[in-house]
Amino acid sequence: MTRRLLLVHAHPDDETITTGGTIARYLSEGAEVTVVTCTLGEEGEVMDPPYAQLVADQADQLGGYRIAELTRALAALSEPAGPVLRPRFLGGAGRWRDSGMAGTPAADHPRAFASADRIAADGPVALLAGIIRELRPQVVVTYDQVGGYGHPDHIAAHTVTTAAVDAAAASGLPGEQWAVAKLYWTVAGRGQIDRGVAAFAETELPGDWSVPESASLPAHDDAALTALIDTRDVAGRKVAALRAHATQLAVAPCGTAFALTNLIAQPVLTEEAYILVRGTAAPGPDGLERDLFAGLE
């Protein structure tokens, strides 16, 4: 069986922060991996001072620049001897715009992804269902129902992906129907976050970074996790991909921590956690799947 994995993310950098190790691991194992990004991240803040004027209320060129960052990040995640993973944008680059955080003026933009007409014939659900029918992935990954940390575009990506998985398996759309075998949410486990933050006590971080209370970082109870993917063998590729998103984040010299523009340290996880929400789990002796394709071959 040719293994095919589709990951749906809201903005450039989300693919690396939450699932970069998983992408790199499955590419190294020869799986067909596709990352669909729903917006260009136009409303992001900028960490790198030379590019600070690219933001939405100035030059409004950040989205185009982030295409280049995403391209470099996906190349970094790719197997050196294999094909280079390329970006794919839902509806094409620029079809939908970053909606910004809840309550900001960006939410009122006519192209804001969070308020897109999802049931339109050319809306995000139909377009993503078309991609699913085209690629025929056994496994699809997106966010949980709160989008990980509450960003409207992450919540919309969750809603759109869930509906698209249903639509791809049903009648009424062009193309041959396809039933996704397993749908996962990308999450972090509370234990992972607690251990990662505790390790900062012995980690040299940049002087202007702050160490958070572990409980302030979003995570799910460990008991809710259904899969843990070991990505230690490709950790260097994940770190390189994080560094490619230089307008959005910085990686500590040690490579085990990163910070967004708020300069709050977060651990670079070398196990990536998931919750299976559709399909049949095939856990190992510890009660967890160690392969997203477990039970399918």
Curated annotation (Swiss-Prot):
Its EC number is 3.5.1.103. Zn(2+) binds at H11, D14, H154. Binds 1 zinc ion per subunit. The keyword NADP does not apply. The keyword Metal-binding applies. GO terms for biological process: mycothiol biosynthetic process. Belongs to the MshB deacetylase family. NCBIfam families: mycothiol_MshB. This is 1D-myo-inositol 2-acetamido-2-deoxy-alpha-D-glucopyranoside deacetylase.
